[in-house]
Regions:
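Extended charged low-complexity segments that act as oligomerization/scaffolding linkers
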Residues: 282-292
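Terminal accessory carbohydrate-recognition/targeting modules of carbohydrate-active enzymes
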Residues: 1-249, 253-265, 276-282
Length: 292
């Protein structure tokens, strides 16, 4: 797991043999512009170009008083894997963590959808898509609350749950689509059952001649690995943790001297990703995927 701190944003990157996830926790600071920065948690998955965003607000109504953070616990440091293959079909994968509120928090907005949908909301006019939001299901589960959404493919389901620990100060309250969490720690699970990608390791994404970069620039090569998969290279994190045809081709051209070639290499992944998404009718190249 990698942790990059850039207050008020805390970025966490987690990947294993089952899935890759990025989690961004935003907790306003005293000098933050509260008109554009509010407490939120984002989960982004390169598989399916999908994710989750949750916006919280202080029950007191006083902006800037609610602080949230990920805490190290027995389930992760702070992130841990979520894996369940008991339902048949694609395994349900994702991340889990312990989320801490310093005061009573109200979940005001939750979006379970494509990264494009989430990005448009966070950076645009904050408009909610009714076709996405209408599919959300809120339910009470033992010790907490669960939010789920069935994708338009009628197969994939994204699920978010928060459950109390012994360090919370009262019960969770669900009122329609508003959820109130007393101050304390909560187990946070974010998962989905979409087919997963195969990540390229640092050794696989770089050419043999460039392997020394792994020791010379470990953070950069680890980041490149997180964005690279056998069937596509993603454009960035978190807002662009998806396929972008133009960006992928330009990046491949610029990085060609150090990228691996041939079967299973990074250059092949870029070309394969572009070819797979070419419009069969007019030959145009797909600019961006919006699956989730």
């Amino acid at each position: 797991m990698q942790h990059l701190s850039s207050p008020p944003y805390e970025n966490y990157f987690y990947s294993d043999c089952h899935a890759a996830s990025q989690v961004v926790v935003t907790s306003p600071r005293p000098d933050s512009n509260l008109s554009i920065i509010s407490p939120r948690v984002i989960v982004a998955w390169p598989a399916g170009n999908s994710g989750i965003v949750t916006y919280f607000q202080p029950e007191s109504g006083i902006n800037g008083t609610l602080g949230i953070q990920m805490a190290n616990s027995s389930i992760g440091s702070p992130l841990g894997p979520y894996y369940d293959d008991s339902k048949g079909g694609n395994a349900t994968v994702g991340v889990c963590a312990q989320l801490e509120f310093n005061s009573t928090a109200v979940l005001a907005v939750a979006i379970l959808g494509s990264i494009r949908t989430i990005r448009d909301f966070t950076e645009g006019p904050s408009l909610l898509r009714t076709d996405v939001q209408g599919g959300l299901k809120y339910s009470v589960i033992p010790g907490g609350v669960e939010i789920s959404r069935l994708w338009f493919d009628n197969i994939t389901t994204t699920t978010l749950s928060l459950t109390s620990t012994n360090q919370t100060r009262g019960p969770i309250k669900l009122d329609n689509t508003s959820v109130t969490f007393p101050a304390g720690n909560y187990t946070f699970n974010a998962s989905f059952n979409y087919p997963q990608l195969t990540q390229l390791t640092s050794e696989e994404v770089l050419s043999t001649a460039s392997a020394d970069l792994i020791t010379q620039s470990p953070m950069q090569t680890t980041a490149l690995s997180f964005l690279s998969y056998t069937t596509k290279l993603t454009a960035g994190a978190w807002r662009f943790l998806t396929y972008f045809g133009r960006d992928s081709m330009i990046a491949a051209l610029l990085l060609e001297p150090v990228l691996s070639e041939g079967r299973g290499g990074a250059i092949e992944a870029v070309i394969a990703g572009v070819l797979e998404r070419i419009n069969r009718t007019d030959g145009s190249v797909c600019h961006e995927e919006t699956i989730g």
